[in-house]
Curated annotation (Swiss-Prot):
The gene is FEN2. InterPro entries: MFS (IPR011701), MFS_trans_sf (IPR036259). It comes from Saccharomyces cerevisiae (strain ATCC 204508 / S288c) (Baker's yeast). It is found in: Cell membrane. GO terms for molecular function: pantothenate transmembrane transporter activity. The keyword rRNA-binding does not apply. The lineage of its organism: Eukaryota, Fungi, Dikarya, Ascomycota, Saccharomycotina. SUPFAM superfamilies: MFS general substrate transporter. Residues 475-496 have a biased composition (Acidic residues). This is Pantothenate transporter FEN2. One of its GO terms (biological process) is pantothenate import across plasma membrane. Residues 49-79, 124-132, 186-198, 293-312, 364-372, 423-434 are extracellular. Gene3D superfamilies: MFS general substrate transporter like domains.
Length: 512
């Protein structure tokens, strides 16, 4: 009896040892994904916003006067950029299904960097519009394309934090661009006969080029593409075949029968996902109207603030955006009953306050500074809505690519005329129409997010499944590695049952 007990104890120790080693291996894989996937997409988005916000910083730092830009020229150039962004959105996302993302995203980064360099030679407003259009074609690969990539590597509980870090990287780029322009104007203005704003575009390119090269060499693309271990990529030295296999299997099973063909369009259109997520991000994107149209920088210029102040003060909006985005991600990842729609409704309430404050006293510096900085909270919507769409559309690869791209495309399509109608540069300092527009989109986005949650619950009930289940627990897999996982996944199974019970309980009270 003693011998048998000793044998059982030894077996338990061995199991604990195996489990511990396996857990360390999982953590190591997640670390590698963060190091080589998340790092590249964040660097790409960071320089994307350095380049993009750099245009506005150049405008208020001498470009307007040097190129004799007048009236709504800034707004028109931004609209031209948005048109290019819209045109490239869906094709870029679909290209990720045909061309390895390592190649396509790196190429697009290099291409828009080269066009940014061309901006230092512009001599007219027409040159600006032409370059900005093609810049946008390539830059449109970044935002929705990255959310597609993140959804291919990360599980539901991992997505909010990574989406928030990604969003935050763009906001850091926005802040960095303002400080960099201030420094460039101070130290390089007039050097070699070039104005400070021209030097900004040159330096932007010098930063963009190494990021494109880094992506081509180290970015692994998608876990289910054999190109991830191409001879031209260092990825084969970073991820082994077993790790790539596990990276695919740790996510929920997809419907492998779906293909990118003519059946894709009716398949996507007959579901509510495409319609509702496109609508909610049209509204959520316009909640950023005051921030995305550089209204604070224009207000500072109108009120005769110094050049350094015009470049630096708007950075506070992006700082608030970073904090609010990270806080919302932590809330959704760590709080058991947290829901995406909770954050959406909170953003709606905050943006209503912003609209009321600016409309009430648009010339009071204390009110305007407070409202503009508070408006940075709307940036949290990027991580919230796109991670939500990633989760709901995960089972259909082609649908997910189209939905994520369409969200950004329709938001851009509306913003192309919305900014002219409500946030034109000649409406400074009051932006009266913009306040009413923000009030409408803030309230509407909150309502639509509640509707999406209702549809999600109804869909989960009809499928009789948990929204997101670890694929390692799916039946029909018999390799040794996964059998070993199954021995140690009892706790995970219990958690899934608990989540399922909680999901079913929500049917009677869906908005708790």
């Amino acid at each position: 009896m003693m011998k048998e007990s000793k044998s059982i104890t030894q077996h338990e120790v061995e199991r604990e040892s195996v489990s511990s080693k396996r857990a360390i291996k999982k953590r190591l894989l997640l670390f590698k994904i963060d190091l080589f996937v998340l790092s590249f997409v964040c660097l790409q988005y960071w320089i994307n916003y350095v380049d993009r916000v750099g245009f506005t910083n150049a405008y208020i730092s001498g470009m307007k006067e040097d190129l004799k830009m007048v009236g709504n020229d800034l707004t028109v150039s931004n609209t031209v950029f948005m048109i290019g962004y819209i045109v490239g959105m869906v094709p870029n996302n679909l290209m990720l299904l045909c061309v390895p993302p390592r190649i396509w995203l790196s190429f697009c980064t290099f291409a828009w960097g080269l066009l940014t360099l061309g901006m230092y030679k512009v001599t007219s407003f027409k040159h600006i519009c032409a370059i900005r259009f093609f810049q946008a074609l390539f830059e449109s690969c970044t935002f929705s394309g990255t959310h597609f990539v993140l959804g291919s590597w990360y599980k539901e509980d991992e997505l909010p934090i990574r989406s928030a870090i990604f969003t935050g990287s763009g906001l850091v780029g926005s802040m960095f661009s303002g400080f960099m322009q201030t420094s460039i104007f101070t130290h390089l203005n007039g050097r070699n006969g070039l104005a400070g704003w021209r030097w900004l575009f040159i330096i932007d390119f010098c930063i963009t080029l190494p990021i494109a090269i880094y992506g081509f060499i180290f970015f692994p693309g998608l876990p289910d593409q054999t190109s991830a271990v191409s001879k031209f990529s260092m990825t084969r030295y970073i991820f082994n075949e077993q790790e790539l296999h596990y990276a695919r299997r740790r996510l929920p099973a997809r419907d492998e029968s779906t293909r990118l063909d003519w059946s894709t369009i009716p398949r996507v259109l007959k579901r509510w996902h495409w319609w509702m997520f496109s609508l909610v991000w049209v509204l959520g994107g316009e909640n950023l109207g005051f921030a995305s149209n550089s209204t604070f920088a224009l207000w500072l210029q109108n009120q005769k603030y110094t050049l350094a102040q015009r470049n630096n003060y708007p950075s506070g909006i992006f700082a608030v955006g970073i904090v609010s985005t990270l806080c919302s991600a932590v809330y959704m990842s760590k709080i058991p009953r947290a829901r995406h729609w909770h954050v959406s409704v909170f953003i709606s309430l905050v943006m209503v306050i912003v609209a009321v404050l600016i409309r009430a006293d648009p010339l009071n510096p204390k009110v305007v500074f407070s409202a503009q900085y508070l408006g940075g909270v709307a940036y949290a919507g990027q991580a919230v809505f796109f991670s939500w769409a990633n989760i709901i559309c995960h089972a259909d690869l082609q649908e997910r690519a189209i939905v994520l791209a369409s969200m950004n495309m329709f938001s851009g399509a509306v913003n192309a005329w919305w900014s002219i109608l409500f946030f034109a540069s000649d409406m400074v300092p009051k932006f009266e129409r913009g306040c009413y527009a923000l009030l409408a989109t803030a309230i509407s986005s909150g309502i639509v997010s509640v509707v999406i949650r209702s549809l999600q619950i109804k869909e989960n009930l009809s499928k009789k499944q948990v929204p997101y289940i670890d694929a390692n627990d799916m039946p029909g897999e018999d390799d040794d590695d996964d059998n070993q996982d199954n021995e140690n996944d009892g706790d995970d199974e219990s958690m899934e049952v608990e989540l399922h019970n909680e999901e079913m309980a929500e049917i009677s009270n869906p908005f708790r």
